[in-house]
Amino acid sequence: MKKCFSFLLTLLVLLAMPVSAFAADDVFTPAQKAYYKNLGLQGTTVNVYNWGEYISEGQEGAMNTVKEFERLTGAKVNYTNFESNENMYSKLSGGGVSYDVIIPSDYMIQRLLEEDMLLPLDYGNIPNYDKYIAPDCKGLYFDPQQKYTVCYNIGTTVLIYNKKLVKEAPKSWSVLWDEQYRDKVLMFNNSRDAFALAQFMLGQDLNTTSEEDWNAAAELLAKQKDAVRPVYVMDEVFNLMESGEYAFATYYAGDYILMQDNNPDLACCFPEEGVNLFYDAMCVPKCTQNKKGAEAFINFMQEPQVALANQEYIYYASPNLAVRQNEDNSLYGNPVVYPKVWPKGQYFYNLPQNILELQNDLWARVKSGQLSADGKAQDRRIYWASGAVGAAAVLAVSARLIHKARKNKEQNLRDLY
């Protein structure tokens, strides 16, 4: 990595102070400003599709990443959010949209590549990739030849709990099935993450292609719905968990840090059964209408100042070496975000189409209650009621036929006489 580290460290120490303490023009070097100005993006539009609460947006004196990119390039950024990889995929695959930068997770990137929905990147337009991206974030399993992605963040799932509402610190996902916490559990509202918790409990491979395994995991989630009545949420978890009303939530490590900042009664653990380890990465979909602008945005997100501001705001582990090596970084050495030893875990891989369809069907049935004991009882009541109605109908038809046969026989006898 060719850079003057001492200069960069000094710069980052200064930048660890609130960005509002500086004039906007002082944040970036003359060379950086000249680079983005000379790209010729003035008057163009860059459409960015990212997770909610997943970029530094200018609140509380933080850098407004999008506004700074617009200021340096003269381009306009349309920035929109999705709640899950599956929602993002549905929007993208449905057609009629044009996104230039998307930031999905590892297994979804695999799917997009398998379905030929991504464009290869021109890394010559992303010089910060070679300058700053850590070796452990290159050639990742979902893009082994490093053609389509630039790592955005690294994270894990965690079990978040409220110390005031929980008797002792949990060690296992099993507490999410404990009836004493009925109506006090917030669960993932996306199928892949929710199923993973049940799969960990059952000792399954998160990427199993056994339909029997998926059905068993669905049954366990249905039992949870009966016993605990969890609330299924995504971005809503922030307000709900910070309010102090819920005992447990399943979410992501970086987001836990944000919640804990607002409610010091919150804590988290890596459950002993394991966690999902994941990477999110920036990609350019084939529906792009501004690939040059997309690659400029991807490069901008790895400028040392931007990467630091982003990490300081969203609290996820950065792939950027300049951020990782900055000892004044507020998360430097944080055991949740940058653990010395990563917890036991598994990565998600893209699943075969038949398993994806089964997963989606089972998830819909879990949430609707069709797989729960109550739902099955209702189904049995409907079945028996339907059977009774059917039997009554058969008897009625039979009676009419017998009656008609008797009338015909009587008429035939009259005709004889």
Each language-model region and where it sits:
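Sec-dependent signal peptide cleavage junction
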Residues: M17-V27, L401-R406
